[in-house]
Amino acid sequence: KKDILIAGSLPAQDDTYLEDKRNSKLIEKDFYDQAKIIGPYVDFFYLDVISSGREIDIASNVALKLSKPVLVGMHLKKNNLLPSGETISEVFQKYKNNNWIGLISACVSPEIVESSISEIIKLNIPFGFKANLWGIDEPTPVKTFNTAKPNEIGTNPNIALGKRNDISAKKFYDFSKKIKENGATILGGCCETNPNHIREISSLK
């Protein structure tokens, strides 16, 4: 038995924090091309900050074809809906398949983690979070602030979205401990968390 499992990130294939409305076949090809390359080197795929049930379904089925389980990372807005307008429960009930090993709220503020946990608990699946520390609760899609051409330097997200300075490593620990006490078994940090935050919560395992 391994003490450490390696996750392979399958992120949103068009833009971050935004539903991908492209043709399903195009999305599937993008996911498959990436998954095929990294698949041999990972234990499972992490569906990394996905904004609609359709994308989750496509990526889950790609992983199934490659015989890999998936940790599903749903991005949520302040209203606890995905950017597509779907609820967590709707996506779970419609698209869950046998290779889902867990469900997390992905790249969301600690406040959104807390407000969405009551719905996730009811789904009877291992759950948790990867919390961000952006300066705003609802980060905007990258393409809205980064319009650089391939030969230009793009806008730094730290400048466009800002960074919270009110969540110390100790506060991140306290927040994570509270979520763990509510049943979460998957704890992590996302954008703008740093090694100090992760070191602090590592004692919660």
Give the label of every model feature segment.
Residues 1-205:
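Domain-level signal for soluble alpha/beta catalytic cores
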